[in-house]
């Protein structure tokens, strides 16, 4: 078909086209001879559908749109409230409780068999949680008991308010690193541990307030500013930084840097290794690290032994503690945890410090922690909810996580969120509901009451080994390779976050990732793609000529589609210049191929992708129209959206182009050439 169109046009192109009307006539003959068009009369029998576009009602203003959305939100709630009023009072109370506390919904159908599964999952979870919580507390520069506190109250609150059945709540490595790396710049935890603890609790309070606000006001889109690629890079960089910091405990080093960048950490390790380090501590830590990693390999290979890697850290703690106690290794340079304060979480409302001179910085750090913690928790929750086949309510998750951190800050807990590694263990152990979190929290509480004295001789190197064993799960090389193959710009955000965390600091890594993500959005807005369209053979479908090389170009017509939702000040001039450039190139190319002068008569602009246009966009369209008219080319508009056609009418642009506005490209070509294409 393409060859027939070209041959027909070639037969006419040997004549010089003196004016537009003659050119149009000759193109019509070419198109008719090609057999790709019906008779002109067939086109005249069709209704003039362009009037539907031009006579459409006025679209709602932005103010009315905002009012409609707010009204719709309130009407939805009002309808729920009215339906609630029709119910008996006891059912009203139950419905309200279920909305706030989902546990009242699923506990009514709770069975003994489900509890057996949750009990096994909760106990398995606790065996992993207890040693990890102690290790993560030391990573956050807090006393070990604060990690255990964080594994008691937040999981209980989440079990009442959360919607995920599998997520395991507690302290995590990345949030612990964020807290220590940013807050120790304000107060040194070594010289002023009480002041540092107050900062941590106040930061946790702010993080919870931000998280709950995101859910209550439906501001979850703020979390999306950290793209998936940025999170992958950030997690990978943070994992390496955390691993390097654990060399202090693994080598038994006393003096260590407070910086988190890789250069400072490696320099500190090198200096310490030349002066003082404990071979006994290193051998002990590496031995149990190998043991934990081997059990993890066995658990992955044999699915029935999923419980083995889960209890391996607890076994490592118990065995190493007995070894140190029996051999008195603590007298030979092996550092131990020593005193861990037991008992129920003490109240800490009085420790929240809102009079500190660092309040502004604490609020900023709280916002960062809130976003990172929510991103991790919601990603984990949605992953496992998808496997189980149910929907996770993102807004309720934000509210639940926010309230658990606010209440956690009142009970000596630091920022908690969902842990991917522990959630995977919880899922593999066969958990049915959030009851597994309750079982885990009760088990940790029992450990706080009864077992803390037994941890006096637990080597710090073992805690470092437990943290190191959890880090490979944070480094997702396969996902990084996948991102590289799919989207190079996303991979740039990944690399920026990774190297930012690794060579600068955690907050710099996050900032780099967000800046690159914004830069991607801005570049796409400034330089949107423009497609040159052609007709698919034997159809009335017009598609991108680069994607589908078999498409047939219509002689004398250039058809463009702008791949952008907005035609605005940021991209209008660029789009105008590129279209004019293509028009000039097309005419030069056609003139080179044939000795006779071949004329472009129409430029058809498909606006089906555009949602809105501003005054700069309209000005650019006017300039494009004026430039095309000077070269004897007419501009035709196709399928503008409601807001777009309204603004073009208001600006009298439709009158300027002679009302050449059509619903489809085919109708535009029919009208231009008087033929049905």
From Swiss-Prot:
<feature type="topological domain" description="Cytoplasmic">
    <location>
        <begin position="448"/>
        <end position="454"/>
    </location>
</feature>
<feature type="transmembrane region" description="Helical">
    <location>
        <begin position="361"/>
        <end position="381"/>
    </location>
</feature>
<feature type="transmembrane region" description="Helical">
    <location>
        <begin position="142"/>
        <end position="162"/>
    </location>
</feature>
<feature type="transmembrane region" description="Helical">
    <location>
        <begin position="455"/>
        <end position="475"/>
    </location>
</feature>
<feature type="domain" description="STAS">
    <location>
        <begin position="548"/>
        <end position="672"/>
    </location>
</feature>
<feature type="transmembrane region" description="Helical">
    <location>
        <begin position="119"/>
        <end position="139"/>
    </location>
</feature>
<feature type="topological domain" description="Cytoplasmic">
    <location>
        <begin position="512"/>
        <end position="677"/>
    </location>
</feature>
<feature type="transmembrane region" description="Helical">
    <location>
        <begin position="167"/>
        <end position="187"/>
    </location>
</feature>
<feature type="transmembrane region" description="Helical">
    <location>
        <begin position="491"/>
        <end position="511"/>
    </location>
</feature>
<dbReference type="Pfam" id="PF01740">
    <property type="entry name" value="STAS"/>
</dbReference>
<keyword id="KW-0472">Membrane</keyword>
<dbReference type="InterPro" id="IPR001902">
    <property type="entry name" value="SLC26A/SulP_fam"/>
</dbReference>
<dbReference type="GO" id="GO:0015116">
    <property type="term" value="F:sulfate transmembrane transporter activity"/>
</dbReference>
<dbReference type="Pfam" id="PF00916">
    <property type="entry name" value="Sulfate_transp"/>
</dbReference>
<feature type="region of interest" description="Disordered">
    <location>
        <begin position="23"/>
        <end position="54"/>
    </location>
</feature>
<protein>
    <recommendedName>
        <fullName>Sulfate transporter 2.1</fullName>
    </recommendedName>
</protein>
<comment type="function">
    <text>Low-affinity H(+)/sulfate cotransporter that may be involved in root-to-shoot translocation of sulfate. Plays a central role in the regulation of sulfate assimilation.</text>
</comment>
<keyword id="KW-1133">Transmembrane helix</keyword>
<keyword id="KW-0764">Sulfate transport</keyword>
<feature type="transmembrane region" description="Helical">
    <location>
        <begin position="305"/>
        <end position="325"/>
    </location>
</feature>
<feature type="topological domain" description="Extracellular">
    <location>
        <begin position="476"/>
        <end position="490"/>
    </location>
</feature>
<keyword id="KW-0325">Glycoprotein</keyword>
<feature type="topological domain" description="Cytoplasmic">
    <location>
        <begin position="220"/>
        <end position="221"/>
    </location>
</feature>
<keyword id="KW-0813">Transport</keyword>
<feature type="compositionally biased region" description="Low complexity">
    <location>
        <begin position="28"/>
        <end position="44"/>
    </location>
</feature>
<feature type="topological domain" description="Extracellular">
    <location>
        <begin position="419"/>
        <end position="426"/>
    </location>
</feature>
<feature type="topological domain" description="Extracellular">
    <location>
        <begin position="326"/>
        <end position="360"/>
    </location>
</feature>
<feature type="transmembrane region" description="Helical">
    <location>
        <begin position="222"/>
        <end position="242"/>
    </location>
</feature>
<dbReference type="GO" id="GO:1902358">
    <property type="term" value="P:sulfate transmembrane transport"/>
</dbReference>
<comment type="similarity">
    <text>Belongs to the SLC26A/SulP transporter (TC 2.A.53) family.</text>
</comment>
<feature type="topological domain" description="Cytoplasmic">
    <location>
        <begin position="300"/>
        <end position="304"/>
    </location>
</feature>
<dbReference type="InterPro" id="IPR002645">
    <property type="entry name" value="STAS_dom"/>
</dbReference>
<dbReference type="GO" id="GO:0008271">
    <property type="term" value="F:secondary active sulfate transmembrane transporter activity"/>
</dbReference>
<feature type="transmembrane region" description="Helical">
    <location>
        <begin position="398"/>
        <end position="418"/>
    </location>
</feature>
<feature type="topological domain" description="Extracellular">
    <location>
        <begin position="140"/>
        <end position="141"/>
    </location>
</feature>
<dbReference type="GO" id="GO:0016020">
    <property type="term" value="C:membrane"/>
</dbReference>
<dbReference type="GO" id="GO:0015293">
    <property type="term" value="F:symporter activity"/>
</dbReference>
<feature type="glycosylation site" description="N-linked (GlcNAc...) asparagine">
    <location>
        <position position="255"/>
    </location>
</feature>
<feature type="topological domain" description="Cytoplasmic">
    <location>
        <begin position="163"/>
        <end position="166"/>
    </location>
</feature>
<keyword id="KW-0812">Transmembrane</keyword>
<dbReference type="InterPro" id="IPR018045">
    <property type="entry name" value="S04_transporter_CS"/>
</dbReference>
<dbReference type="InterPro" id="IPR011547">
    <property type="entry name" value="SLC26A/SulP_dom"/>
</dbReference>
